[in-house]
From Swiss-Prot:
Its main location: secreted. Antibacterial activity against B.subtilis, E.coli, S.aureus, M.luteus, P.putida and S.cerevisiae. Disulfide bonds join 2-10. GO terms for biological process: defense response to bacterium; defense response to fungus; killing of cells of another organism. It is found in: Secreted. Expressed by the skin glands. Keywords: Amidation, Amphibian defense peptide, Antibiotic, Antimicrobial, Disulfide bond, Fungicide, Secreted. GO terms for cellular component: extracellular region. This is Tigerinin-1. The modification Tyrosine amide is found at residue 11.
Length: 11
C-alpha cells in the first residue's frame, strides 16, 4: 500500500 503521511512511500 502507499501512504503520503508523514512522507510519500509505498510498501
Amino acid at each position: 500500500f502507499c501512504t503520503m503521511i508523514p512522507i510519500p512511500r509505498c510498501y
